[in-house]
């Protein structure tokens, strides 16, 4: 079997893999992307984030908002985010946009239906093989899933619906609605209005289990009926997924292999926000790729934020009701730019202290000590 040689091999054509291939398109590097699914498989998810970092996908942003709201029981807080607009991007649009550039480039190949890959470190790179090909490259960027020992998972299920009067409910995103009856669990509803007649309504848990058993489509339908007083609507599509809220991911898998994407540690443990963190990681890799020193040491989160996340996740895991109250109060009481920067990995030291001082002192100290005992 003849071995074909590449500069880089990218494993996985998800958000991270396609983002990296998109940046490397039409460069001097010869690149091969290996994807386990067929070319016909298209994901249908919504990626949302505050625009705190410039990304190259502004043309395909589905919608952008200058404010959003959160609620707890009968209290509602409307938050201004003009400085950092809340943006929504459809994964389907992202895949089409990036693949269009990649497939029209002269330096990137994409192979689909790739199963049972074997990676072998060589003295001058990596040998990547399957039953029907053998490849060699200088470096592998691997976005494939790995088994994680995560204590908490964010699991979600959503319905895209059409109804003539949806704009009468919320005209802006309702990011966290804690008004349901699941008081002993960290659960919230999420409402994203794309047009006057179409919205995404999602049920989200922070759960110790990574399965989707808690997520009931019937619950979402009942919530729409009880809270929004809507009995008849069209379901356009559905989405479901899980995000590890892990604090222990590794970035480097070997001398010639670098993990990228969700399973490399870029996902913010306390929020699950991933898309912009992937773009930051990819920009770092592309910027440093010309040095030919592939011992990348990218750290997506500061040690201070990770420590704060440990405390926050400890509260959620052990006292979900207080976790919901704290989350709501943070949006209600603290300057909106401070909160958004904190949740988006770009806070100043002053922002971090403002967040700390806003927390209920007894709860903060209790879980601070709990985290320190487990260090």
Give short role names for the model-derived ranges.
Residues 283-375:
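C-terminal helical "tail/cap" subdomain of flavin- and related membrane-associated enzymes
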Residues 23-74, 157:
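N-terminal FAD cofactor-binding segment of flavoenzymes
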Residues 11, 142-143, 259-261:
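Redox-cofactor binding/interface segments in oxidoreductases and associated redox assembly factors
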Residues 105-231:
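Predominantly flavin-linked oxidoreductase catalytic cores and closely associated redox partners
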């Amino acid at each position: 079997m003849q071995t074909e040689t590449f500069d880089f091999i990218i494993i996985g054509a998800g958000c991270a893999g396609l983002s990296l291939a998109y940046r490397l398109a039409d460069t001097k590097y010869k690149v091969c992307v290996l994807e386990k699914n067929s070319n016909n498989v298209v994901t249908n998810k919504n990626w949302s984030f505050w625009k705190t970092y410039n990304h190259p996908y502004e043309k395909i942003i589905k919608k952008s908002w200058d404010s959003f709201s959160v609620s707890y029981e009968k209290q509602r807080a409307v938050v201004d985010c003009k400085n950092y607009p809340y943006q929504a991007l459809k994964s389907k649009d992202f895949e089409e946009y990036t693949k269009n550039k990649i497939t029209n480039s002269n330096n990137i190949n994409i192979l689909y239906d790739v199963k049972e890959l074997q990676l072998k470190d060589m003295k001058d790179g990596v040998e990547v093989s399957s039953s029907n090909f053998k490849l060699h490259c200088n470096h592998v960027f691997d976005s494939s899933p790995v088994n994680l020992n995560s204590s908490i998972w964010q699991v979600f299920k959503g319905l895209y619906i059409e109804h003539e009067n949806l704009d009468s409910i919320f005209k802006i995103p309702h990011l966290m609605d804690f008004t349901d009856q699941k008081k002993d669990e960290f659960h919230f509803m999420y409402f994203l209005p794309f047009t006057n007649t179409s919205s995404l309504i999602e049920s989200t848990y922070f759960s110790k289990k990574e399965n989707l058993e808690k997520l009931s489509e019937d619950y979402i339908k009942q919530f729409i009926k009880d809270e929004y007083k809507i009995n008849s609507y069209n379901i356009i599509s559905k989405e479901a997924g899980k995000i590890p809220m892990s604090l222990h991911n590794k970035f480097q898998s070997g001398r010639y292999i670098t993990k990228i994407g969700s399973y490399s540690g870029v996902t913010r443990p306390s929020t699950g926000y991933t898309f912009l963190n992937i773009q930051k990681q990819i920009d770092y890799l592309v910027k440093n790729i010309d040095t030919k020193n592939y011992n990348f040491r990218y750290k997506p989160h500061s040690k201070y934020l990770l420590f704060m996340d440990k405390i926050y996740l400890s509260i959620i895991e052990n006292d979900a009701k207080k976790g919901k109250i704290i989350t709501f109060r943070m949006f209600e009481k603290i300057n909106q730019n401070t909160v958004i920067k904190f949740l988006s990995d770009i806070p100043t030291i002053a922002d971090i202290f403002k967040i700390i001082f806003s927390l209920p002192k007894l709860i903060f100290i209790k879980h601070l000590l709990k985290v320190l005992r487990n260090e």
